[in-house]
Amino acid sequence: MSLKQRYRETIQPKLLKDLSLSNIHEVPKVLKITVNRGLGEAAQNAKSLEASITELATITGQKVVVTRAKKAIAGFKIRQGMPIGCAVTLRGERMYAFLERLINLALPRIRDFRGVSPKSFDGRGNYTLGVREQLIFPEISFDKIDAIRGMDITIVTSARTDEEGQSLLREMGMPFRSN
């Protein structure tokens, strides 16, 4: 059963009851997932940007957008318009497929993994998680990478509070660490 189907058939009715909501449309849901990678070295090394674009496209299965510097910062040796990172926004079927792969395949492959921090919510039910290395994703093989780079994964939900967002992600299988 896919994550989307499981959400519709079991998670949604359970959250409706647990959060004591009156309408099925009030139940929190995942709206989008953004995968972002900031590359400071992209200003000097164009190959690192190309490698990152290829890796993110392989991991997410979607075209990557290059993020550029909004203004020049002499201390970082960047000019306005220089590429400094890349990002992908996932919605719909690809979003659910990515979330399922993240929870079931990627997170358990992290070394010394005891669960993700429950403190990484932003106050509005959205969850951000930093990944230190791209090798946790099964699509990336060790031979093909030039350097170990991390990424930020933000899960945007329609939850109004952190508690609602956490209960949604917990029901979906996100392994939160118990502090």
From Swiss-Prot:
Gene Ontology cellular-component terms for this entry are:
ribonucleoprotein complex; ribosome
Query: Domain of life here?
Result: Bacteria
Q: Which UniProt keywords apply?
A: Ribonucleoprotein, Ribosomal protein, RNA-binding, rRNA-binding, tRNA-binding
Q: Do you know which InterPro entries this protein is assigned to? A: Ribosomal_uL5 (IPR002132), Ribosomal_uL5_bac-type (IPR020930), Ribosomal_uL5_C (IPR031309), Ribosomal_uL5_CS (IPR020929), Ribosomal_uL5_dom_sf (IPR022803), Ribosomal_uL5_N (IPR031310)
Is Acetylation there in the keyword field? no
GO MF annotation terms: rRNA binding; structural constituent of ribosome; tRNA binding
Q: Please list the GO biological process terms of this entry.
A: translation
User: Does tRNA-binding appear among the keywords?
Assistant: yes
Indicate the quaternary assembly. Part of the 50S ribosomal subunit; part of the 5S rRNA/L5/L18/L25 subcomplex. Contacts the 5S rRNA and the P site tRNA. Forms a bridge to the 30S subunit in the 70S ribosome.
Role description: This is one of the proteins that bind and probably mediate the attachment of the 5S RNA into the large ribosomal subunit, where it forms part of the central protuberance. In the 70S ribosome it contacts protein S13 of the 30S subunit (bridge B1b), connecting the 2 subunits; this bridge is implicated in subunit movement. Contacts the P site tRNA; the 5S rRNA and some of its associated proteins might help stabilize positioning of ribosome-bound tRNAs.
Into which family does the record put it? Belongs to the universal ribosomal protein uL5 family.
Q: What is this protein called?
A: Large ribosomal subunit protein uL5
Tell me what organism the protein belongs to.
Answer: Prochlorococcus marinus (strain MIT 9313)
